[in-house]
């Protein structure tokens, strides 16, 4: 089916079912949801909880959440501001609300298996492990997205864009504070078999354990990171906490290099569409 919101907003929803999965304005979407905003609402469940949709297998476009997404203490996972678990396409969506849970927690999507494009988060995102400003656990593609919200995990796999990455992150950036225990990075906490290209972070990175980096916490042997930068004035440690994979042009830049436009130039280099600007 098709839900066309016509730029209207939905306000005052309250749903708290601690043993329920697929919770949101729509619990499950197999059609098309577009042009709707969720305000002053609260969604709490066991797994797959999102402000707009709990579980998406199709398309969500031009939607946003300004409500609270919450997971119970013994929750299974997949909590996102827009969508809890995404097996479809999220485009031009954003979250400004609080998102909290245990595992797989993200500002836009908790668990992304397909596509997130042109989305952003400014809300506070917190969880235990697999926590990210855009997505908690990525095995799909994340493109042209940015996080400005505070991201925190009490344990591991925490990143400004994605906590854990197994596929592709391109043209994304983070300006929010990122905090966790181990495997913590300004862009991504744990890059397993994924590719991260043309990404940038200027937010603080704080890790109390091991494998902490300005860009990536840990890059495994099958991981690839290319043309990614971080503000070395804000975070004075290494770009990658532990690098076992393939890297090229992954380094810190000073605030002066950001101000002159050098970093924007490097990120835009060789791209036909204008993505990065000063």
Where do the model's predicted regions map?
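Predominantly extracellular beta-rich ligand-binding scaffolds that present long acidic/polar faces
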Residues: 1-278
């Amino acid at each position: 089916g098709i839900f066309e919101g016509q730029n209207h907003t939905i306000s005052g929803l309250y749903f708290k079912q601690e043993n329920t999965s697929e919770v949101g304005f729509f619990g499950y979407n197999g059609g098309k949801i577009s042009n709707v905003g969720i305000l002053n609402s609260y969604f709490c469940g066991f797994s797959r909880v999102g402000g707009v949709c709990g579980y998406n297998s199709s398309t969500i476009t031009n939607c946003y959440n300004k409500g609270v997404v919450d997971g119970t203490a013994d929750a299974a996972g997949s909590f996102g501001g827009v969508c809890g678990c995404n097996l479809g396409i999220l485009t031009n969506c954003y979250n400004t609300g609080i998102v909290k849970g245990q595992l797989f927690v993200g500002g836009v999507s908790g668990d992304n298996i397909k596509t997130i494009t042109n989305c952003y988060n400014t809300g506070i995102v917190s969880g235990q492990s697999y926590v990210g400003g855009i997505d908690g656990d990525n095995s799909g593609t994340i493109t042209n997205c940015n996080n400005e919200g505070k991201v925190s995990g009490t344990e591991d796999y925490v990143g400004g864009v994605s906590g854990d990455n197994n596929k592709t992150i391109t043209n994304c950036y983070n300006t929010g504070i990122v905090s966790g225990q181990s495997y913590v990075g300004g862009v991504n906490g744990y890059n397993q078999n994924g590719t991260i290209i043309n990404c940038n972070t200027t937010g603080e990175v704080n890790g109390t354990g091991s494998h902490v980096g300005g860009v990536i916490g840990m890059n495994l042997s099958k991981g690839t990171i290319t043309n990614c930068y971080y503000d070395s004035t804000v975070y004075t440690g290494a770009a990658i906490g532990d690098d076992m994979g393939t890297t090229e042009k992954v380094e810190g830049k000073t605030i002066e290099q950001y101000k002159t436009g050098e970093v924007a130039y490097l990120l835009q280099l060789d791209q036909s569409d204008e993505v990065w600007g000063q």
